[in-house]
């Protein structure tokens, strides 16, 4: 249903209502993004969007790396709830309209960060907290230890969504492709994205093909 302000209200099974403004313009920039104050990781929200029979999941092509496949996800901004952010990303990147059935939890994108200063700050905080020593003066911290202590690039809260319909016109329709995939197809497509794959594994997608 629509409210007077144009927001779309979706009734979810737990009787929570999530208002989503389906604008035709994607949000850009990071001025409103949320960040973990300790790790510096960007806080994100995303959807594992399933077909009504739960046999397929909707993947979208990455805007930065082709022909890589991902699920709709992006920054959780300061003026919205995490559920609103997840559904907004589903709309902007995949043109999907649906309802949240449950939270899948928070998952860390542990691919190496390209922000060296953030890495050093995180390591310094960890070492100071654990031993009272400044990491910059601790000569025992080797390359392997540093690798293990790398801060996550992002921390994403994923939600399982049942897709009600896919719109032909949506904000990123010229930037991305979208494709329904079976569990096995999606598993192969997401081999380089362990965070997304872990969220898929926790979803209710049917894993056995008849």
From Swiss-Prot:
Binding site for Mg(2+) 1: 73, 93
UniProt-annotated binding residues for Mg(2+) 3: 89
Catalytic activity: diphospho-myo-inositol polyphosphate + H2O = myo-inositol polyphosphate + phosphate; P(1),P(6)-bis(5'-adenosyl) hexaphosphate + H2O = adenosine 5'-tetraphosphate + ADP + 2 H(+); P(1),P(5)-bis(5'-adenosyl) pentaphosphate + H2O = ADP + ATP + 2 H(+)
The protein, known as: Diphosphoinositol polyphosphate phosphohydrolase aps1
Record keywords, A-Z: Hydrolase, Magnesium, Metal-binding
GO CC entries: cytoplasm; cytosol; nucleus
Gene: aps1
Residues at which 5-diphospho-1D-myo-inositol 1,2,3,4,6-pentakisphosphate binds: 42, 62, 73, 111, 176, 193
Family note: Belongs to the Nudix hydrolase family. DIPP subfamily.
Residue ranges of the motif Nudix box: 74-95
The protein's required cofactors: Mg(2+)
pH effects: Optimum pH is 7.6.
Residues annotated for P(1),P(5)-bis(5'-adenosyl) pentaphosphate binding in this entry: 42, 62, 73, 109, 176, 193, 195
One Gene Ontology biological process: diadenosine pentaphosphate catabolic process
Domain Nudix hydrolase, chain residue ranges per copy: 40-203
GO MF assignments: bis(5'-adenosyl)-hexaphosphatase activity; bis(5'-adenosyl)-pentaphosphatase activity; bis(5'-nucleosyl)-tetraphosphatase activity; diphosphoinositol-polyphosphate diphosphatase activity; endopolyphosphatase activity; inositol phosphate phosphatase activity; inositol-1,5-bisdiphosphate-2,3,4,6-tetrakisphosphate 1-diphosphatase activity; inositol-1,5-bisdiphosphate-2,3,4,6-tetrakisphosphate 5-diphosphatase activity
Outcome of gene disruption: No effect on cell population growth at low, mid or high temperature. Double knockout of aps1 and siw14 is lethal; the effect is suppressed by knockout of genes involved in mRNA 3'-end processing/termination.
EC number per UniProt: 3.6.1.52, 3.6.1.-
């Amino acid at each position: 249903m629509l409210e007077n302000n144009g927001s779309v209200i979706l009734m979810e099974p737990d009787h929570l209502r999530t208002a989503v403004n389906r604008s035709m313009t994607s949000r850009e920039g990071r001025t409103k993004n949320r960040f973990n104050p300790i790790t510096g990781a960007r806080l994100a929200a995303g959807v594992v969007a399933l077909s009504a029979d739960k046999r397929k999941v909707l993947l979208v092509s990455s805007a930065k790396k082709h022909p890589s496949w991902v699920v709709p996800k992006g920054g959780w901004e300061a003026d919205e709830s995490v559920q609103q952010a997840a559904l907004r990303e589903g709309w902007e990147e995949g043109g999907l309209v649906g309802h949240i059935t449950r939270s899948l939890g928070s998952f860390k994108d542990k691919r190496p960060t390209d922000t060296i200063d953030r890495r050093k700050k995180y390591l310094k905080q960890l070492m100071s907290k654990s031993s009272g020593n400044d990491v910059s003066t601790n000569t025992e911290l080797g390359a392997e230890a540093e690798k293990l202590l790398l801060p996550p690039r992002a921390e994403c809260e994923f939600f399982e969504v049942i897709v009600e319909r896919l719109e032909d016109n949506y904000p990123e329709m010229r930037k991305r492709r979208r494709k329904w995939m079976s569990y096995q197809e999606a598993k192969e497509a997401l081999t380089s994205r362990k965070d997304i794959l872990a969220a898929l594994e926790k979803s209710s997608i049917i894993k056995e093909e008849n």
